[in-house]
């Protein structure tokens, strides 16, 4: 068994089937899951740190810490439901979100990461919620899909739209009709030599 197969076996859920959508590379699929688990752990940890800011009477940092911890628990619930085996409905919730398109998860993670940063801008909220934001960005990139092949991009670039003439590819295609070339060999005939 190769190292990649061991890693994918550790990060795969029991009875998990491959998604029906466009195939993603294994390192992106499981790397995003691993990033989400790490992000959730640090969001909970730094959210707890922000909650302790009540000592300095900063209510906004207290609220930001609570929101960051909730976001960390939600991300952990969706990425690693095995951490919440004591709750019966966790697998159903994770499967429901798993069946949604990837851009749904990306939007959810990005939306959960922004309020703690706005409420209490500091290293703890920036790092904890920033990792969740990064996980959302990775899922957003996966939702966009991979780039088309070179042949497909060339074919799309050569298509004509609305009956226009095909694109000209010679060197003088962008020059205005009847334009005279510049000449630096002598003075222009209308120059007054002033």
Swiss-Prot record:
> Phenotype of the disruptant?
Lethal; mutants die either during the embryonic stage or the first instar larval stage. Embryos frequently display head involution defects, some do not develop a cuticle and/or occasionally display dorsal closure defects. The nervous system of embryos also displays developmental defects. In presynaptic terminals, intracellular resting calcium levels and endocytosis is impaired, whereas exocytosis is normal. Boutons at the neuromuscular junctions exhibit a significant depletion in the number of synaptic vesicles.
Protein location: Cell membrane; Cytoplasmic vesicle, Secretory vesicle, Synaptic vesicle membrane; Presynaptic cell membrane; Endosome
Which sequence ranges are listed under topological domain Cytoplasmic?
Answer: 1-34, 89-106
Name a single GO biological process: synaptic vesicle endocytosis
Q: How does it sit in the membrane?
A: Multi-pass membrane protein
* Regulation of its activity: Channel activity is inhibited by La(3+), which reduces Ca(2+) influx and thus inhibits it's function in promoting activity-dependent bulk endocytosis (ADBE) in response to high stimuli.
Kindly state which keywords UniProt assigns to this record, in alphabetical order. Calcium, Calcium channel, Calcium transport, Cell membrane, Cell projection, Cytoplasmic vesicle, Endocytosis, Endosome, Ion channel, Ion transport, Membrane, Synapse, Transmembrane, Transmembrane helix, Transport
Q: Which InterPro entries match?
A: TVP18/Ca-channel_flower
Tagged with keyword Transmembrane helix: yes
Q: Which family does it belong to?
A: Belongs to the calcium channel flower family.
What is the protein's name according to its record? Calcium channel flower
Q: Which organism is it from?
A: Drosophila melanogaster (Fruit fly)
Gene name tied to this protein: fwe
């Amino acid at each position: 068994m190769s190292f990649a197969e061991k890693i994918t076996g550790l990060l795969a859920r029991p009875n998990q089937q491959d998604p029906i959508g466009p195939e993603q590379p294994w390192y992106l699929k499981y790397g995003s899951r691993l990033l989400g688990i790490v992000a959730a752990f640090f969001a909970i940890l730094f959210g707890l740190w922000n909650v302790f800011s009540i000592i300095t009477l900063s209510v906004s940092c207290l609220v930001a810490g609570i929101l960051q911890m909730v976001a960390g628990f939600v991300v952990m619930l969706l990425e690693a439901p095995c951490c919440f085996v004591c709750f019966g409905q966790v697998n159903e919730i994770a499967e429901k979100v798993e069946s949604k398109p990837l851009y749904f998860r990306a939007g959810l993670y990005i939306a959960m990461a922004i309020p703690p940063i706005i409420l209490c801008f500091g290293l703890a909220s920036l790092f904890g919620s920033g990792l969740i934001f990064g996980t959302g960005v990775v899922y957003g990139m996966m939702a966009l899909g991979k780039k088309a092949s070179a042949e497909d991009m060339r074919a799309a670039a050569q298509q004509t739209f609305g009956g226009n003439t095909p694109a000209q590819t010679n060197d003088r295609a962008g020059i205005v009709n009847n334009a005279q070339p510049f000449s630096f060999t002598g003075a222009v005939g209308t120059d007054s030599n002033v």
